[in-house]
Amino acid sequence: MINPIVKTIELPDGRTITLETGKLAKQADGSVMLRMGNTMLLATVCAAKDAVPGTDFMPLQVEYKEKFAAFGRFPGGFTKREGRASDYEILTCRLVDRALRPLFPDNYHAEVYVNIILFSADGVDMPDALAGLAASAALAVSDIPFNGPISEVRVARIDGQFVINPTFDQLEKADMDLMVAATYDNIMMVEGEMHEVSEAELLEAMKVAHEAIKVHCKAQMELTEEVGKTVKREYNHEVNDEELRKAVREACYDKAYAVAASGNNNKHERFDAFDAIREEFKAQFSEEELEEKAPLIDRYYHDVEKEAMRRSILDEGKRLDGRKTTEIRPIWCEVGPLPGPHGSAIFTRGETQSLTSVTLGTKLDEKIIDNVLEHGKERFLLHYNFPPFSTGEAKAQRGVGRREIGHGHLAWRALKGQIPADYPYVVRVVSEILESNGSSSMATVCAGTLALMDAGVKIKKPVSGIAMGLIKNPGEEKYAVLSDILGDEDHLGDMDFKVTGTRDGITATQMDIKVDGLSYEILERALNQAKEGRMHILDKITETIAEPRADLKDHAPRIETMTIPKEFIGAVIGPGGKIIQGMQEETGAVITIEETDGMGRIEVSGTNKKCIDDAMRMIKAIVAVPEVGEVYKGKVRSIMPYGAFIEFLPGKDGLLHISEIDWKRLETVEEAGIKEGDEIEVKLIDIDPKTGKFKLSRKVLMPRPEKK
């Protein structure tokens, strides 16, 4: 007998979310079916009983999958089944992973797999905002150790009002789109985009989201009680040697502190100095002893190194590379280093460097999006590549990973609002990270701004980005907010808070917090400190190039657009595409046409102005409305005993009656020297109101002979 347990959560606007367990996927360690309207997500979690030998990290894998059947659709492709994860699914995985990962115990190293599957969708409610809640609820009803629960909500600002988990339609009207994950007590993760909002407005949105999350967390706690999973499984994944831990600290801490406070701004030299301390300590042991003790020494020394770095910052205000907490690394920029792309730039900040290129394309280059719930075309693309050599690693480069997709998406969100909505070009920005020591996604934003301006893209305002960090020990009042963090400060610190924006406000943000008890006061300080840093970086950008170039590069495509009444779309295309293809062959231009907002939108692109002008002239002739009294240059299509048929506009023929050819009487058309294929000037003298036929005259354009 199945006896499911159901919990209902009510949103501020009266909509409800239900969490049901005990009915589906009962062999998983935990499973929950979440439902909101007709959107249904099944989240399952399974954990291995034992840790993977030699593992000193949290082997968590989060998968999010949308089934096409959920929305009554067939998958595309030859096989007609779901394939590899889309970018949207990967980004949703990352949102959930980043919220869950910090809350597993530090000494828990068993493999944990979280699977979230969209089984039903209505196209109204957005499933990505529900995935975090579903995953946390599955953990809540399991016996897997987890310091949750958490929940994740989307908060949008629409007409000045904050809305929790807006619908697809509502989100289109929002000027702020923020995903927030939190426990009952603390915010853990934030990511979103916005239309140049202030720091205070961003904080307000976080607070609104957190209040909604508290309700979700309370429901999960009640669910845990009802299921009877308040006591989690016992585990022992770490073997410790307290004497060895003490010995490592006594022998290494002062030396590690000296390196941390030395102010060496060379990452590899610092790494070698820290590594030498550990190897010196290991040298006292035999090879046989090290087989057992080396993993423990590595773990204990990592803790020592972390503490030394943190204490140097908290006690002396000295960072690893010698900077003050608010100081930005040296910046140099260059625009136009590459002659081939339509725009390019180098942005270097300390040991982080991005070489970014911009390519301009036509409508044919748009990216087609065909996910389960997301359809359309994207005209602004940003790709981020992170090769191993950027950190000096000797390893093969594989395909694009989740991290690269996530970092590229953040930079895309930061910049996309500055591309004018009516900009005719499809724009692709590609950031190649050539060096990395922290904040490479923010370097991408800065290099992207420079490259777009170098390409002559008429961006509204330049955008810069900065990554902020935090050092805060539990139970200590003292803390330090760090501007422009290094990779080690990200790894050994408590927060990674990325903020991008123009001079007038924030355009995108991403925050991951690894510590409990982070107050809004600290967040406010971090945001204000980030603003100072952003303004400094913007100054460096505008010193290099103050505004977009007036003209495109010579080898960039040229585009002209025009709109026509939709009833002329067929005339421009022609039967089987004959007319439009003929124009393209004749002129060398690329012509695209689509119906938008009840009008035909035509885009003509080419490598030179002449081919575009020729194509535009031909299109204008096709869509021109014949006017009585206008003079046209037409081609003789056929000759009849009673006159000639003239094509005076593309696709429009009129009769030039024999009596209208000349003032003198003609027996045949040929007497006037007219033959098929000739081009002659004619005047439209009448349009038959019943048949719509056109009557032309040639003689009215000729001098009338005087009467004898």
Swiss-Prot record:
Mg(2+) binds at D490, D496. Belongs to the polyribonucleotide nucleotidyltransferase family. It comes from Bacteroides thetaiotaomicron (strain ATCC 29148 / DSM 2079 / JCM 5827 / CCUG 10774 / NCTC 10582 / VPI-5482 / E50). It is found in: Cytoplasm. Pfam families: KH_1, PNPase, RNase_PH, RNase_PH_C, S1. Disulfide bonds: none annotated. Its main location: cytoplasm. This is Polyribonucleotide nucleotidyltransferase. It is an enzyme of class 2 (transferase). Residues 629-699 form the S1 motif domain. The keyword Transferase applies. Involved in mRNA degradation. Catalyzes the phosphorolysis of single-stranded polyribonucleotides processively in the 3'- to 5'-direction. Its EC number is 2.7.7.8.
